[in-house]
């Protein structure tokens, strides 16, 4: 049995190449109806070089039609320059405007601070620059279509420009949340709840079943911890990524310093080589933020800070006395945050505040277990004496937000991604418990590992829409509509041939068929035989040659020693032409047909000639006063008060009321009419 073509298959396949029971290198492959989509293309922050990539070797990049990037974090877009520049991928790539603006600078910083050799680097600054030309942008709620795949995006919260993508293929809808947050903060709106319910929801599970502390309590704890560190004469290190949570923390610290004059002499530094560029982007895209920021921008730009200075590198830093430094990267694998941590970790007055989610295998995750010593990038062992606090400002949903989001959408299938194995398992169990006794809502929860496929079946109805000329009149019950079925991507239309050029790129062409058939018999005999078959033969002259129109579409022209058939090719006309050809060949090859022709099929009898001569003939038989003409097609004969009416076209006789029993009158009139007809149309 042959395999079903991918385009006709009802199987939908979802396979994580990254972020399957892990956090990092998000990359989800979606396959349905012969279309392939990649959702995000990130790197693993705890790994280096090729090891940090998703399992791209399991796919053929040339087969991917569409690549959608949810936001600018490295674990969601860090492998994109490599994928666009170093593979056979030829599809189209989309992200929001803000994501594209920040992607450029964030990955530039990643290239510069990566602590690996040039040979192990996945891509260069040049690759990154060239990848920009291959990335297209999409506005929130703007519907686009690529290769029959419709998609649009919603605000996801999380970071500036973060998007959730709704994808529709052949009527099946899938929502990919990426990283999202349902809690509005100081500058970002909460993630939207789409008004369209998806069939499949691919959702992050970073925090599993944890419940976040309230925003006000978290901010107060953060500010108090920073205050305590500088009060004891220490230096506060807050490792963050250059963009994202950093801007939220800067807004909090700037406001806190403003309200505490005693802190005005203690500097706050935003230490990133991208500091100025990043802030310029944030100052540009305020319209993508929440209402509070949009209103405030009319008075002053909240991202122009009063108490925070930019620090490009350690060369510009006077490390004297207490200070607060926000430095990238967030997990301290390399860069400024790692340098400062190694410099300050041996002094118990100093403190580090981990303010975001930390991936396994990173220094930030390691120090949260409070080890007695750490290993520097040069391999030296140092005692860890500085205080370590974890206050999560990570803008991911907690269990309450996740479960409410699922409850609002009620998708039949939920696919969990972007979560550590145990957290994901706990979330899956909690969601199953929530819906196991609910008879109205049935939700299947899946948590695939990396490279493990989830296969779902969706049997969509095929509906064809009648358009154009065929749709001008409302059809009646039982009416047959005939047209051309046009399939474009996953839409079917029935069109009249004359509408093809209006609704498609197809050109309308006609093929005129001509066929010559040997024929030496009488042409009027052929006319007679075709008339017996069809009941409707029109006699014509074409270029002074006798011709017939049969079935209204087949023309038969007499030529010396043959007849020529002409018709416009289509399935019905071709069938009619085959029938006419069969009749011609039968008449030509069978002499009995000519001998057995009882009907005299000469030239077509002129009706008015026949009528006049029959009238004279009947007057000779019955008397001049007994015969009269009615309506040009009826001859009436009255004898001894009995009347017989002769139909000139059919040569049949009907007797009027009271004359039915006079069979002799009817027979005499009918016989006279038939004899005259045969005399006027002799057999050749």
Curated annotation (Swiss-Prot):
Glycyl lysine isopeptide (Lys-Gly) (interchain with G-Cter in SUMO) crosslink location in chain: 462, 465, 545
PTMs per UniProt: Sumoylated on Lys-462, Lys-465 and Lys-545, preferentially by SUMO3.
InterPro entries from the UniProt entry: Beta_Casp, CPSF73-100_C, MBL, Metallo-B-lactamas, RibonucZ/Hydroxyglut_hydro, RMMBL
Taxonomy, superkingdom: Eukaryota
Listed EC numbers: 3.1.27.-
Name of the protein: Cleavage and polyadenylation specificity factor subunit 3
Cofactor note: Binds 2 Zn(2+) ions per subunit.
Modified sites of kind Phosphothreonine: 681
The keyword Repeat belongs to this UniProt entry's keyword annotation: no
Binding site for Zn(2+) 2: 75-76, 179, 418
Alphabetical list of PANTHER family matching this protein: CLEAVAGE AND POLYADENYLATION SPECIFICITY FACTOR FAMILY MEMBER (PTHR11203), CLEAVAGE AND POLYADENYLATION SPECIFICITY FACTOR SUBUNIT 3 (PTHR11203:SF11)
Residues engaged in binding Zn(2+) 1: 71, 73, 158, 179
Key words of the record: Acetylation, Disease variant, Endonuclease, Epilepsy, Hydrolase, Intellectual disability, Isopeptide bond, Metal-binding, mRNA processing, Nuclease, Nucleus, Phosphoprotein, Ribonucleoprotein, RNA-binding, Ubl conjugation, Zinc
Keyword RNA-binding in record: yes
Function: Component of the cleavage and polyadenylation specificity factor (CPSF) complex that plays a key role in pre-mRNA 3'-end formation, recognizing the AAUAAA signal sequence and interacting with poly(A) polymerase and other factors to bring about cleavage and poly(A) addition. Has endonuclease activity, and functions as an mRNA 3'-end-processing endonuclease. Also involved in the histone 3'-end pre-mRNA processing.
Compartments it resides in: Nucleus
Family membership: Belongs to the metallo-beta-lactamase superfamily. RNA-metabolizing metallo-beta-lactamase-like family. CPSF3 subfamily.
GO terms assigned for molecular function: 5'-3' RNA exonuclease activity; metal ion binding; RNA binding; RNA endonuclease activity
Sites of N-acetylserine modification: 2
Subunit field text: Component of the cleavage and polyadenylation specificity factor (CPSF) complex, composed of CPSF1, CPSF2, CPSF3, CPSF4 and FIP1L1. Interacts with CPSF2, CSTF2 and SYMPK. Interacts with TUT1; the interaction is direct and mediates the recruitment of the CPSF complex on the 3'UTR of pre-mRNAs. Interacts with WDR33. Interacts with ZC3H3.
Active site (UniProt): 396 (proton donor)
UniProt modified residues of type Phosphoserine: 659
GO cellular component terms, A-Z: mRNA cleavage and polyadenylation specificity factor complex; nucleoplasm; ribonucleoprotein complex
């Amino acid at each position: 049995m042959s395999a079903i073509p991918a385009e006709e298959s009802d199987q939908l396949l979802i396979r994580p190449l990254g972020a399957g029971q892990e956090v990092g290198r998000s990359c989800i492959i979606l396959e349905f109806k012969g279309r392939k989509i990649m959702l995000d293309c990130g790197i693993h922050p705890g790994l280096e070089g090729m090891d940090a990539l998703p399992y791209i070797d399991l796919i053929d990049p040339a087969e991917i039609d569409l690549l959608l990037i949810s936001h600018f974090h490295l674990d969601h877009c860090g492998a994109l320059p490599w994928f666009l520049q170093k593979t056979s991928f030829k599809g189209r790539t989309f992200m929001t405007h803000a994501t594209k603006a920040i992607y450029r600078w964030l990955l530039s910083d990643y290239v510069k601070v990566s602590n690996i050799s040039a040979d192990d680097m996945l891509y260069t600054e040049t690759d990154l620059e060239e990848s920009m030309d291959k990335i297209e942008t999409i506005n929130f709620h703007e519907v686009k279509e690529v290769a029959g795949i419709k998609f649009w995006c919603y605000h996801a919260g999380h970071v500036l420009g973060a998007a959730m993508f709704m994808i529709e293929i052949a009527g099946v809808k899938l929502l990919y949340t990426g990283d999202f947050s349902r809690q509005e903060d100081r500058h970002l709106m909460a993630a939207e709840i789409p008004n369209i319910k998806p069939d499949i929801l691919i959702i992050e599970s970073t925090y599993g079943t944890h419940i976040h502390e309230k925003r006000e309590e978290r901010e107060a704890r953060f500010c108090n911890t920073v205050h305590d560190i500088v009060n004891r004469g220490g230096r506060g290190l807050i490792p963050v990524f250059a963009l994202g949570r950093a801007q939220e923390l800067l807004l909090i610290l700037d406001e806190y310093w403003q309200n505490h004059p005693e802190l005005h002499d203690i500097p706050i530094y935003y230490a990133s080589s991208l500091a100025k560029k990043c802030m310029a982007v944030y100052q540009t895209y305020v319209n993508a933020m929440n209402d509070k920021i949009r209103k405030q921008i009319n008075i002053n730009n909240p991202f122009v800070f009063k108490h925070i200075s930019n620090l490009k590198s350690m060369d510009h830093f006077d490390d004297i006395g207490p200070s607060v430094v926000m430095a990238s990267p967030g997990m301290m694998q390399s860069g400024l945050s790692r340098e400062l941590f190694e410099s300050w970790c041996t002094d118990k007055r100093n403190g580090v505040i981990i303010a975001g989610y930390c991936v396994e295998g990173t220094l930030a995750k390691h120090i949260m277990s409070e080890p007695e010593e750490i290993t520097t990038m040069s391999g030296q062992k140092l005692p860890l004496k500085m205080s370590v606090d974890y206050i999560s400002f990570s803008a991911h949903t907690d269990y309450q937000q996740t479960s409410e989001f699922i409850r609002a959408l009620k998708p039949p299938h939920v696919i969990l991604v972007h979560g550590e194995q145990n957290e994901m398992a706990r979330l899956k169990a909690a969601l199953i418990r929530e819906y196991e006794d609910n008879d109205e809502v049935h939700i299947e929860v899946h948590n695939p590992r990396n490279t493990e496929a989830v296969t779902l079946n969706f049997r969509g109805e095929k509906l064809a829409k009648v358009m154009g000329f065929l749709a001008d009149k409302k059809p009646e019950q039982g009416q047959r509509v005939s047209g051309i079925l046009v399939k474009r991507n996953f839409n079917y239309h029935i069109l009249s041939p004359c509408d093809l050029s209006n609704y498609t790129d197809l050109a309308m062409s006609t093929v005129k068929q001509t066929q010559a058939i040997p024929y030496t018999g009488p042409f009027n005999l052929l006319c007679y035989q075709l008339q017996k078959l069809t009941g409707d033969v029109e006699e014509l002259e074409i270029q002074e040659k006798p011709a017939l129109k049969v079935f209204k579409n087949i023309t038969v022209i007499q030529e010396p020693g043959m007849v020529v058939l002409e018709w416009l090719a289509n399935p019905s006309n071709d069938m009619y032409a085959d029938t006419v050809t069969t009749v011609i060949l039968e008449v030509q090859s069978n002499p009995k047909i000519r001998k057995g022709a009882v009907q005299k099929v000469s030239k077509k009898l002129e009706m008015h000639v026949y009528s006049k001569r029959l009238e004279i003939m009947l007057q000779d038989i019955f008397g001049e006063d007994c015969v009269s003409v009615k309506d040009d097609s009826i001859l009436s004969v009255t004898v001894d008060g009995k009347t017989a009416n002769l139909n000139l076209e059919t040569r049949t006789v009907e007797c009027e009321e009271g004359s039915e029993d006079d069979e002799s009158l009817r027979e005499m009139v009918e016989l006279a009419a038939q004899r005259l007809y045969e005399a006027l149309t002799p057999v050749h």
